[in-house]
Amino acid sequence: MTATKQHKKVILVGDGAVGSAYAYALVNQGIGQELGIIDINKDRTQGDAEDLSHALAFTFPKKIYSAEYSDAHDADLVVLTAGLPQKPGETRLELVEKNLRINQQIVTEIVNSGFNGIFLVAANPVDVLTYSTWKFSGFPKERVIGSGTSLDSARFRQALAEKIGIDARSVHAYIMGEHGDSEFAVWSHANVAGVKLYDWLQDNRDIDEQGLVDLFVSVRDAAYSIINKKGATYYGIGVALARITKAIFDDENAVLPLSVYQAGQYEGVEDVFIGQPAIIGAHGIVRPVNIPLSDAELQKMQASAKQLKDIIDDAFANPEIAAGVKN
């Protein structure tokens, strides 16, 4: 894919709640010119393609269709949302055994089509499945990207914005680490319109320290709350994936919190994909943005990475999984 290519094509693998929400966001925002949808349920993909096409007269021209893996050969971006859903009370990491096998099959099919673009992974546990997509594809790490903590960071900014009465676009704050239970807030660099959050709160006592702790917990556990109430989360992640797609297709060099490969950017954190800010453009990850972490934050990053690394090592100790490795 090049930054000058005018016709941009997405292949979406997984037409469940998240995949459908992402497809709808692409149509609404006019991102890309072609969208092929792959799922084991062909009736579903055909129905979604037809339904989405009926919105085009109100939005932007686009070719939308039920696709086969062979259609990925000339795609610019393959988005992976396929996998078994997270059940109430189930952690994202408990999904790993089941979804790794699904991921291996899908990635193999996509690569065999001749695909040579960028993988964007959203299936959970996303950090583990981004790693496995990299291993199974043999692609450069820059062209395998996970949605990471993009949604978590958006939730964090929105929660802070609501608490202090400021537009979320003027609140700059990141969640880093695993997209899941071991994620953490980078309080040391959170700011409101360039003013450090702690300094802002000295002059505007909208929330105390315990309130900040409670706010983070609500952000971390937001998915569980939503799943318990409606069965799944999909609108937020659908829009987050559309935002990442736009940054790639428009060669924005935007800084977004994504699941990216760790090669020692942070002491003690290596050979995992994990959430941190990164510059993203037409060719994938330009480079990670290594925010200086406080000692406490670095310890949380290391602990989060270790948890992911232990799960990855256990999974790839399975000969059937290891047999598919290309990287």
UniProtKB/Swiss-Prot annotation:
Subunit structure: Homotetramer.
Protein name per the record: L-lactate dehydrogenase
Positions that bind NAD(+): 18, 39, 44, 69, 83-84, 122-124, 147
Notes on how activity is controlled: Allosterically activated by fructose 1,6-bisphosphate (FBP).
Residue positions binding beta-D-fructose 1,6-bisphosphate: 157, 172
Function: Catalyzes the conversion of lactate to pyruvate.
Annotated keywords: Allosteric enzyme, Cytoplasm, NAD, Oxidoreductase, Phosphoprotein
Any one of the GO CC terms: cytoplasm
Pfam families linked: Ldh_1_C, Ldh_1_N
Catalytic activity field: (S)-lactate + NAD(+) = pyruvate + NADH + H(+)
GO molecular function, one term: L-lactate dehydrogenase activity
Localization terms from the record: Cytoplasm
Pathway listed: Fermentation; pyruvate fermentation to lactate; (S)-lactate from pyruvate: step 1/1
NCBIfam families assigned to the protein according to its UniProt record, in alphabetical order: L-LDH-NAD, PRK00066.1
